[in-house]
Regions:
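N-terminal Rossmann-fold cofactor-binding loop
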Residues: 30-34, 49-50
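Short amphipathic alpha-helix with an adjacent loop that forms part of the alpha/beta core around
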Residues: 54-63
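Short loop/helix-cap segments at secondary-structure boundaries that form the rim of catalytic
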Residues: 34-42, 84-85
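Rossmann-fold cofactor-recognition segment
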Residues: 41-53, 73
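NAD(P)-cofactor binding segment of oxidoreductase domains
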Residues: 63-120, 135-137
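Conserved beta-loop-beta element that borders a ligand/cofactor-binding pocket
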Residues: 95, 137-160
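Glycine/proline-rich active-site loop of Rossmann-fold NAD(P)-dependent oxidoreductases
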Residues: 159-170
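N-terminal Rossmann NAD(P)H-binding glycine-rich loop of SDR-like oxidoreductase domains
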Residues: 3-23
Length: 174
């Protein structure tokens, strides 16, 4: 398959891209082009400014991918800048369990209502993290219902290449 990974040079994106390559997929990564990677000529590269609509349009318009895996969309505008310009058979949005409000011990997928909540186009700095992630999903549910998309909601993401030191923070504060 022809797969576009938006992100993919840091954190668990590295492992994802390597696994996709191992499985024989034709992988393109879309990044700012600032973080070195070890993929060599095994991937195609597209340089983007993720939060700039014109950059996204120029980089993606007219291109087709079987699958787009968007690892770095945070807000509704991030979703729009991909969904309006790239042609794909399936869009996979890496979301977060932060979209659930309230989140509780027995949270299930249907606890999230993407259809009837108040939707706004927004940028990353307009609301706290959980609100911009909700707006990103509201965009998918309300503005792109005819497209084939899925939201993968991670509860907590860690790996051996965690540059955020997220787990270390909790270990040190126990």
């Amino acid at each position: 398959m022809k797969i576009l990974v938006i992100g993919g040079t840091r954190y668990f994106g590295i492992h994802m891209v390597n696994k996709l390559l191992e499985q024989g997929h034709a992988v393109t990564i879309a990044t700012r082009g600032k973080t070195p990677d070890s993929y060599g000529d095994k991937v195609e590269r597209i340089t983007i400014q993720r939060t700039n609509e014109e950059s996204m349009r120029e980089a993606l318009q007219g291109k087709h991918f079987d699958v787009v895996i968007d690892k770095i969309a945070y807000c509704s505008n991030d979703i729009r800048y991909v969904m309006d310009y790239v042609d794909c058979d399936k869009y996979i949005y890496m979301s977060s369990t932060s979209v659930y409000n309230p989140k509780h011990m027995n949270t299930v997928e249907s606890d999230f209502d993407g259809y009837s909540k108040n939707f706004v186009w927004c940028d990353r700095k307009e609301f706290p993290y959980e609100q911009i992630k909700r707006q990103a999903e509201y965009a998918l549910w309300q503005k792109y219902p005819g497209k084939n998309w899925i939201a993968v909601r991670y509860p907590f993401a860690i790996c051996k290449d965690d540059y955020t030191k997220r787990l270390l923070f909790y270990v040190e504060h126990v």
